[in-house]
Regions:
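Short, low-order "capping/linker" segments at domain edges
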Residues: 64-68, 167-175, 282-289
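Short, surface-exposed recognition loops or helix-turn segments adjacent to catalytic cores
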Residues: 48-59, 76-82, 97-98, 152-166
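Hydrophobic alpha-helical hairpins/lids featuring a short glycine-rich hinge
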Residues: 26-27, 36-49, 59-67
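Active/ligand-binding-proximal structured segments within catalytic/core domains
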Residues: 1, 182, 192-206, 215-217
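An aromatic/glycine/proline-enriched structural segment found at the starts
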Residues: 91, 101, 116-119, 124-189
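M16 family metallopeptidases and their MPP-like homologs
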Residues: 1-42, 75-97, 122-128, 182, ...
Length: 297
């Protein structure tokens, strides 16, 4: 399960050998696709819902996973920042709110959610390898033949172009390394709004070892253990993450803001710009290196 904007995406995948490599000449790819589709359209449930015992186990495991995030302080700090920054948006749904909803799931409500997904979810099938496109389409239609008429749609994500004020949250925890996370509205109206310019800007600012945050905050001034920036495209938010000693907090903030002003004033070098473009292009080219990478792009 992954999050894209204010929507969740469920990904199911299966890997098998090519049919030409089987001993008996049977179609492994076709059988694998049928198995994958059956997991989606024919789960272990009846008219009364999913198995209470299996559901109870999944609720417990999911709750444990949510509650354990605090053990990963970097991830926890990121989550708390987004919860605070997007407090009035679906994107800012808190860990406790999610946990409360998870514990309320029943066999019947889960069955209803599954049916809703089949009726309204956008289904995308990526098949990589020596497999017939027509065969894939045929098996997909057969798998959904009992679903009836579908009305697929994806709810729109709210993009906030500019923050009205500054919100700050500090939590005291026992740990060796403090975490500083900053969130900025990227001025985007949707996920495609001048995306590539913003992608390069974020990369020059804090995307790699050539970036201004890495070269100055970490290397030149030695104010942190790490300092990086990334763009959450699906929500239009630029996030800066840094591991610091708490006594250096203000110094780190001042230097990050100084580097941001340099970016805003266009005072970065042509070398920085070209290094960023090369790194991003190389990353996009690498998507073709493996079947898995191709299937998820």
């Amino acid at each position: 399960i992954s999050r894209h904007g204010e929507n969740y995406r469920i990904q199911l995948s299966i890997t098998c050998i090519d049919d030409s490599l089987t001993f008996d000449g049977k179609s492994v790819t076709g059988a694998s696709l049928e198995l994958l589709l059956s997991l989606l359209t024919k789960p272990s449930a009846d008219e009364n819902g999913f198995s209470p015992e299996q559901l109870s186990t999944e609720i417990r495991l999911t709750a444990e996973d949510i509650e354990s995030e605090i053990n990963d302080k970097r991830s926890y700090a990121m989550t708390r920042m987004l919860e605070t920054m997007c407090a009035d948006e679906i994107y800012g749904l808190t860990k406790n709110e999610i946990l409360e909803n998870v514990k309320k799931v029943t066999p019947q409500s889960l069955l209803a959610a599954w049916k809703f997904m089949l009726k309204n979810g956008i289904i995308q099938l990526n098949a990589i390898g020596n497999i017939s496109e027509d065969d894939c389409k045929k098996k997909l239609r057969e798998a959904f033949s009992d679903v009836g008429e579908r009305t697929p749609y994806e709810p729109e994500t709210v993009f906030v172009e500019e923050a009205e004020d500054l919100t700050e949250l500090t939590e005291e925890l026992t740990m060796n390394q403090s975490k500083l996370v900053l969130g900025f509205r990227g001025g985007m109206t949707d996920e495609n709004d001048d995306f590539y310019s913003r992608r390069i800007m974020t990369d020059v600012f804090g995307g790699g070892p050539y970036s201004r945050l890495f070269m100055n905050v970490r290397e030149k001034l030695s104010l942190c253990y790490y300092c990086s920036a990334r763009l959450i495209r699906g929500k239009g938010i630029i996030v800066i993450q840094s591991g610091i000693e708490k006594e250096n907090r203000q110094k780190v903030l001042d230097e990050i803001n100084r580097q941001l002003d340099i970016m805003k004033n266009g005072e970065f070098s042509d070398e920085d710009f070209e290094a960023s473009k090369k790194a991003i292009c190389d990353a996009y080219r690498s998507f073709n290196d493996t079947p898995d990478a191709v299937s998820y792009t």
